[in-house]
């Protein structure tokens, strides 16, 4: 996480003040009367307080929660608009959302928030808004060709309850309390206009640095190969001049709910797991990489063993997911989920595969087709949910989200 990702808002002062008050005389014991400096054994400010008060900017050309460092907790919230949808309804919806998001990301509660103390712990909160075809049509704008359900893949066992909707809210923060509070406040504000379709909650390992991969519940290092979205590969993430004008500086989100059969995965030895993945489990390095290599080491897809077989199996996940053209890359921002199991089952766990890109049909579909054809991990994984959303451009000062959509 870079310094530019985070700033410490006014909420930190309140947190610090509370901490000092609670410490009372015990805190003063480390000081001599009138001494200008703390005692030698004073550990200094608690870094957890700074993390709790950390904020990320809302205003700008692009929305937060995409190219910035993933937080530890997430909720993907899908809603349908109630009744007919026209430009008036869309403007009202986006006006309410813009005001509430602006306040919450700054560590302030919305106007109707009766628990503003919870909003005062933003914990790097980001709130990202995506829309479906019905909202685009209601705004009177043309939709991009890719804003539609993905084509069917042979491995899919999709459940209607996890399908696409009119509106998506991605709520991410480094505190589960912050995520829960922000989610509730947004839903309360939208209650007259929307009905809730589904909520998918996820988590991932906390990391200090930006762009670091996570481990999913298979123990697999996930999200290792990412485009340079802050440099040469920006066009792979952000919509440009070949897209509808209202979507420029926006993006596309593909959200796939992938159920992982941990019960049968437990029966697989580590060597077989590494063969299926194409990477070493301990470091995430390709199985062709030399000792000491990390997850960013390039794979040797041509390497063969003494019998003439590929070292990286023809069905290994790494090989099937590997880009075969420069445009077959996208920004992965996945989260794991672990929900209560159904009766008779030991687990209901998996991956919320969230990927951002400029054009899902051109970038994502070819990769997913190769995975569906022959990925060895298909033995233990089943896609049960799939949705595509247009991620709105950001809102500059004085604008609402989706301003250009309604122009």
Q: What residues fall within each predicted segment?
A:
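N-terminal secretory signal peptides
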Residues: 1-10
